[in-house]
């Protein structure tokens, strides 16, 4: 008679967490950066890693002001996005350059998460973050602003980033290299 052994709780947890593991890709525009977010998602999937995309422009959260802080009737429900970030293995942020900085959709999202999340620091502290931009201009200022923001929040921002613009076309080799850096 063969006895079938039931996996231990730890093994079940490891199997479940590996299957549920994902990279969260945030798109801070509904145009070319959303297309870039989808390219990242597809590339992660080809490497065997699940990816989820959130288009921040569809959140329709009000512009954060201190007057709205704590007003339950006007504050957005950040719990779903907080949960997605908290449970992700890494973040990829795709954002265009707006007037030399990151776009309002990203800045507003971070502002609301900072006041509405149960533990804001837990969302970003020690989290791997990859930055990417598809910008009409160079995109360097947006990347610097995002790097500063996420570093301030305690994230581990990957040194290399992806920049697409009129003089820098998409490179799958660059994307593959960046994905490997996230998966390490």
Model-derived segments and their meaning:
Residues 28-30, 56, 134-136:
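Cofactor-binding loop segments of dinucleotide-utilizing enzymes, especially the Rossmann-like FAD-
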Residues 22, 152, 156-184:
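Glycine-rich phosphate/pyrophosphate-binding loop and the adjoining helix
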Residues 73-153:
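Helix-loop-strand module that forms the ligand-binding subsite of alpha/beta enzymes
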Residues 47-52, 155:
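A generic structural motif
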Residues 20-47:
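N-terminal beta1-alpha1 ligand-phosphate binding loop
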């Amino acid at each position: 008679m063969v006895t079938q052994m039931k996996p231990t709780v730890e093994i079940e947890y490891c199997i479940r967490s590996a299957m549920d593991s994902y990279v969260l890709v945030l798109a801070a525009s509904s145009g070319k950066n959303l297309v870039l977010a989808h390219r990242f998602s597809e590339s992660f999937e080809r490497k065997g890693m699940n990816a989820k995309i959130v288009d921040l422009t569809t959140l329709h959260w009000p512009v954060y002001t201190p007057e709205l802080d704590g007003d339950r009737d006007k504050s957005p429900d950040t719990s779903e996005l907080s949960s997605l970030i908290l449970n992700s293995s890494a973040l990829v942020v795709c954002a265009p350059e707006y007037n030399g900085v990151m776009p309002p959709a990203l800045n507003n999202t971070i502002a609301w998460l900072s006041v509405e999340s149960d533990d804001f620091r837990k969302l970003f502290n020690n989290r791997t973050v990859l930055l990417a931009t598809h910008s009409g201009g160079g995109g360097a200022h947006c990347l610097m602003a995002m790097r500063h923001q996420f570093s301030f929040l305690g994230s581990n921002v990957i040194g290399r980033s992806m920049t697409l613009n009129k003089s820098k076309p998409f490179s799958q080799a660059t994307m593959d290299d960046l994905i490997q850096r996230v998966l390490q």
